[in-house]
């Protein structure tokens, strides 16, 4: 059985055309007319593929690659095998992505899972819902009362939009996603299985753990992307806000009243407790946990698997458990590693002949 290809192959390009597109320099001009039909990793590329090299860990793959051409920085140019055309680039990966985006435009955003345009017969749409022209609704999706959906948006199979939800233009709501009490801007990509706008985790910690009403909303601004399985709680009093251009990975939990600034990057399995604020351009590595009511300043970065219990200043580089400035954290790690491996108080030790002491 032939291996299926899930993405359409774009038109082929000559190396001269790729060089112009990526602002790279073709080192051997005699190869300008060689045609490239796709992109691939160095170890899987063939003569019609473009690859890139930027990480010294893959030097072995570069030495053995069968790629037709490789984007590479001047530093590693001499390591490219002679049968491979060299495209010299200041940032090889950035150049590679520019070409990949051109030939795989269908991979840039999800489309209807059923290759539909318009409304599937099995979709349930309340008569008071308002859908602009060009909206696609896949089978078994449910659109509730007073919902508004902008032109060009795609609602995936089995998605549920609860009463009053607003979806902007050119959005994609993935299959099985549930959205309630939320206002969503334009060009927002929500991958399958997300839960947006449910109750925040609010209780009075008495014997009966009385529930606190959660009467806020979720506001998602333009150009946000939300990964599969992510959950975003609505606010209790003020709104939960996801700022313009922020990109959230899979399986992230965002608590009630959280404010995330513009153009933030949040990797998988982060947990953001209620009422904390992230500034603009904040980056969180995978599995970062942040306590409630904290402020993470503009441009701050927190390394993966860190636990944050204090405010992080703007442009801070923090990490660890509990998180602190990375330079301090690294010094403490080195200090621990330099501690004696034996002879510490209370530890078993042996004399030079290997006999136990004490």
UniProtKB/Swiss-Prot annotation:
Pfam families: Hexapep, LpxD. One of its GO terms (cellular component) is membrane. GO terms for biological process: lipid A biosynthetic process. Its EC number is 2.3.1.191. Pathway: Bacterial outer membrane biogenesis; LPS lipid A biosynthesis. InterPro entries: Hexapep, Hexapep_transf_CS, LpxD, Trimer_LpxA-like_sf, UDP_GlcNAc_AcTrfase_non-rep. The active site is at 256 (proton acceptor). Keywords: Acyltransferase, Lipid A biosynthesis, Lipid biosynthesis, Lipid metabolism, Repeat, Transferase. It comes from the Bacteria. GO terms for molecular function: N-acyltransferase activity. It catalyses: a UDP-3-O-[(3R)-3-hydroxyacyl]-alpha-D-glucosamine + a (3R)-hydroxyacyl-[ACP] = a UDP-2-N,3-O-bis[(3R)-3-hydroxyacyl]-alpha-D-glucosamine + holo-[ACP] + H(+). The keyword Lipid biosynthesis applies. The keyword Ion transport does not apply. Catalyzes the N-acylation of UDP-3-O-acylglucosamine using 3-hydroxyacyl-ACP as the acyl donor. Is involved in the biosynthesis of lipid A, a phosphorylated glycolipid that anchors the lipopolysaccharide to the outer membrane of the cell. Homotrimer. Belongs to the transferase hexapeptide repeat family. LpxD subfamily. This is UDP-3-O-acylglucosamine N-acyltransferase 1. It comes from Rhodopseudomonas palustris (strain BisB18). The gene is lpxD1.
